[in-house]
A protein has these predicted regions:
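Short, glycine- and small/hydrophobic-rich beta-strand elements in well-ordered beta-sheets
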Residues: 44-69, 109
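Short, charge-rich amphipathic segments
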Residues: 13-33
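Short, well-ordered beta-strand segments in beta-rich or mixed alpha/beta enzyme
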Residues: 20-27, 57-84
Length: 112
């Protein structure tokens, strides 16, 4: 799988109300990229059902499949915190994916 983008909304609909944009970059440890892709394919449908989740886009670099890029738009800071406390985040991300990473960077942005 090269790309994950599952959402019933268009991007323009998702950003209308503003919100908190989280951009993250992951790099898998050697030999772990396909395992991470599998974890993300199970995580994403559950994350997209969160009430405060406006948009999730998760991509895999074409020239380096060990790199993943995330664009996550939440209604507000409270929705982002609820996301991090969700059972699926704790299971798939904290429990399964993070130990397989060589590098993780994350930044938060307010939409203009």
């Amino acid at each position: 799988m090269d790309r994950y983008a599952i959402n019933e909304r268009t991007i323009s609909e998702a950003v209308k109300g503003g919100g908190l944009l989280v951009v993250a970059q992951w790099e898998a440890k050697p030999g772990q990229a396909d395992r991470i892709a599998d974890i993300l394919s199970r995580f994403l449908p559950e994350a997209q059902r969160e009430p405060g989740a406006q948009l999730f886009l998760i991509s895999r670099a074409k020239d380096n499949p060990a790199q993943f890029l995330f664009y996550e738009l939440f209604r507000d800071e409270a929705a982002f915190k609820a996301h991090q406390e969700s059972a699926h985040f704790k299971t798939y991300i904290a429990g399964e994916a993070l130990p397989l990473l060589a590098k993780r960077e994350r930044a938060q942005y307010a939409l203009l």
